[in-house]
């Protein structure tokens, strides 16, 4: 009986690790990283700070695991969308829609704070470079399918958009306009510029439907 009670009171280390990552990731995204302490996370989970430090040695290690979790979820989503989509533009539009939703629900301080953690920031840069290569491969497939122009240097365009997004995360632009509004303007202008007539028609259908859904959800 005691053994059973102990198992209920003390979940496995793996289960505890998952709970910690879930709670920490949600807290970091909602409030920013700097404002959330290890004490806050322990309190939210109802565990001691000592127990938390037994699982994660420090805040940066925990943050890195949180980002790995988010990246794994993103990879799974890409795979699912790719398997169901009928063309590459549909894949990209769904991915951008997910990005918009993620940015909308993320505190801007999260992006500002991440630079204070060198190991985590370095991991993000490496991941960003890998994602860029995959994005360019998508665009090349889109050319073959007739959705994107074949006279565009996608390596340059992708770099420019990436730098625009980096700038967005590190300026006061969002004090005048909402983060979501600026992000949408960048992405939709970008996609319009690289699309063929066929791609542009598909894109405008998506934008119209997306904005109708967003308006309906805000009413």
Give residue spans per PLM region.
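All-alpha amphipathic helical-bundle segments outside canonical DNA-binding/catalytic cores
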Residues: 90, 127, 144-160, 174-184
């Amino acid at each position: 009986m005691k053994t059973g009670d102990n198992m209920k009171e003390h979940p496995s280390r793996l289960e505890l690790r998952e709970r910690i990552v879930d709670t920490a990731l949600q807290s970091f995204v909602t409030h920013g990283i700097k404002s959330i302490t290890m004490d806050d996370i322990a309190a939210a989970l109802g565990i001691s700070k000592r127990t938390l430090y037994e699982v994660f040695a420090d805040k940066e290690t925990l943050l890195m695991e949180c980002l790995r979790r988010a990246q794994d979820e993103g990879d799974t989503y890409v795979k699912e969308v790719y398997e169901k989509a009928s063309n590459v533009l549909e894949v990209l539009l769904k991915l951008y829609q997910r990005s918009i939703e993620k940015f909308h629900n993320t505190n801007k301080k999260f992006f500002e704070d991440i630079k204070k953690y060198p190991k985590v920031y370095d991991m993000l840069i490496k991941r960003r470079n890998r994602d860029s290569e995959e994005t360019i491969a998508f665009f090349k497939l889109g050319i073959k399918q007739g959705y994107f122009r074949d006279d565009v240097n996608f390596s340059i365009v992708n770099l420019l958009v990436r730098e625009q997004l980096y700038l967005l995360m590190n300026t006061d632009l969002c004090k005048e306009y909402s983060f979501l509004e600026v992000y949408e303007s960048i992405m939709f202008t970008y996609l319009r510029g690289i699309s063929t007539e066929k791609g542009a028609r598909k894109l405008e259908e998506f934008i119209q439907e997306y904005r109708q859904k967003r308006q309906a959800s805000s009413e």
